[in-house]
Amino acid sequence: MIREWKNDCQRIEKQRASDTMVQERKNEKPVRIFNTNSSFQDQAPTCCQEDLSSASPLRIWSKFYRSDPRIALGKYSPLEKEILRLGGIHTIAARRLLAYKQEEECRMLKELQLLSPDYKQAMEYKKKHSSPCAICVPLEKIWTAKVIAPLEAFKMPQREQVNVSKHIERMRLARALGNHQPLPYIERFTRSSFLSGVGLGPMAKNKARRKEDNYDTHNCDDANQDKKEEAEGKNTKRREIKMNVVFKSKEPKKCLTYHGNDRKSFLPAKKPERSIAGLTNRNLFCISEFPGDLMLMNQDFISRRDHFSDLVKTYSLEEESIWKERMRKATPYHY
């Protein structure tokens, strides 16, 4: 791209020079030559010291935009030189530098996006005309339903009520003791088993336990009486509740793309080890024609729990029987 720019600049300069020569010959007046380097000469006074007519456009560009780390006249850009100075791309310092540069670039990009009215307009247009994705957003419908249930279903169980009341009383006692405020029911707490009972004798502990049991049984009796009264007088009363129920619609099945390597197991399949007694090439040969080592043959026979001499005898007997059958077939019959 830089070479094309050089060629275009040279071609334009030649055309302008030829046009000015023609105009001077016609009008016989000197005409000012507008060089491509005049803009750089006006903007960058530091470049005026050198002869810009002989300088290449690439050098002028690199000197004018010296602050840009992506443009370099030599072999490496300023950012690459800094990375090499830190010891290379694999060093910790170079990675920190690259991370810092990336964060700085993202921060600058966000600032420019906030200042740009075109970006805001594009984002508003995208929000208006973008359709919700069926895969990203689940299709749901909210319905209001009426549920009729008895009042007993909304009551707290008696055991939980007792635990909550005990917890409330403990918190009140702790707050009163912390604020040094005497309460009228502190004596009742001290008699009951809410306290640990440290420093009391065995008789006092038994009395406290009996009082606690009596207190619990009394509460249970009161609760049973309340339940009976409510069951007798309020059996017919029911309550209606309005609640929002969410029904998830049937989502479309996602099309999963499978690759050939995905179906393979992650661990490589174990190759069957070659064993001496296994199915090898020597099973294709006869025992006498096997071109292997005798030691391996011996190991094979030992693994099969056979002896070499017995196998040779059986094989020789089989050969003799086969030979006899062939001879019988070959002999003519005499009538």
Curated annotation (Swiss-Prot):
It comes from the Eukaryota. InterPro entries: DUF5520. Residues 201-236 are annotated as: Disordered. Residues 210-235 have a biased composition (Basic and acidic residues). Signal peptide: none annotated. It holds the Pfam family DUF5520. Dispensable for normal development and fertility. This is Uncharacterized protein C10orf120. It comes from Homo sapiens. The lineage of its organism: Eukaryota, Metazoa, Chordata, Craniata, Vertebrata. The gene is C10orf120.
